């Protein structure tokens, strides 16, 4: 979780300080490998930054933090265009992601930047908040959306049909 914040260097930002971030992750991977474990790094960064692709090029799988919001967007707007565009990119780029619509972090929002417009993300946030979600802003920043904490079922309006559709899309 949040491996990109691990290495700290005075004067640098606290996120993805290269090469220190990769060196730290590699040391952890070596320890994991010695015990037969596989690492699954989690990183929240806007889609447009391409960080998930860097993680894949380094040989790691990573969480697909784009799927949860894109599925809600597609279901609620009755339009799968953006979801399909993203799915095509996944097929082409093969970034080795693991799908997980529901998790302990709620619904990632920061990651959607570059897939949805700011206005679309703000609408999605408002919808999920109206269903009981709570906004969590990026650490150290004000009014910079990070995620909306709630269950995926709640984010879908506690609608069993929408939840079944979301899980079918996940598969």
Regions found by a protein language model. Give the residues of each.
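Active-site and adjacent substrate-binding regions of carbohydrate-active enzymes
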Residues: 1-171
